[in-house]
Amino acid sequence: MAFDELATAVTEPELDTHEPTVVEWSGDGLLMIEVDWSGERVRVQLEPEATRSWTAEILADRIARLHRLALMRARAEQRERLNEGGLAIETTAGFPSHADVDEYRRTINF
């Protein structure tokens, strides 16, 4: 048995299934979201100042919005990798383009 950086037990199959992840930070650096393209691996990091200065509603909204951005970017990158491998996956809501990601990123104002 192995342990991850938070001393959580990690089984051997989990060690072998690491997909590429993407990380998105809030502009103020108080919130970080890391996800893989499937959305199964998620890591959230909050700096102490976030819990002191944001209400629960603001925190929930910011986590949801930054998670969406990170997942969109991860899926855009996965679509690109698959297409480079010979598939022809069209841009969809589930597999957005990088332009779609950039457009959504402009709505993140925190």
Task: Give names to the regions the model predicted.
Residues 1-32, 43, 48-110:
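Acidic, negatively charged sequence signal
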Residues 36:
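Short, acidic, Ser/Thr-enriched surface-loop or helix-capping motifs
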